[in-house]
Amino acid sequence: MYKAKISNQSNSDHINDGLKLKNAFITAALKCVPPGDKPEKKELENCFPYFKNEINLLKNIKVIIALGKVAFDACVDFYKKEYNLTKKIKFGHNNVYTLPNNILLVGCYHRSPRNVNTGRINERKMTLLFNKFFKLI
């Protein structure tokens, strides 16, 4: 996010370290760390009301970049429940969909060690994706 000029510093180490985001909000669909980093359906269901409240509080959303399939699926689930979304939406890096309220949903591979080590995602790909979509806001 720093290289795409969305944040004022390259990392955040604690809550009061001065990080500022420009026209961005970061959240997680899953609010806990599940055993083995494999979220179960029940865990996602338990967190859904919090995720839903966050999305509903944000009034000027133009683009949602979902980092990973779990985040992407949570966004799709939200739109199915809140907007009766019926079209088929499939996760993929740089897959873009216009949602019922004209917000763009963008899939992005998660920066997990496996995805980074295999080259599926890297800093350059993330920066290109962020630059492409943050020009819209």
Question: Where do the language-model regions lie?
Answer:
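A polyanion-binding, active-site-adjacent surface
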Residues: 1-137
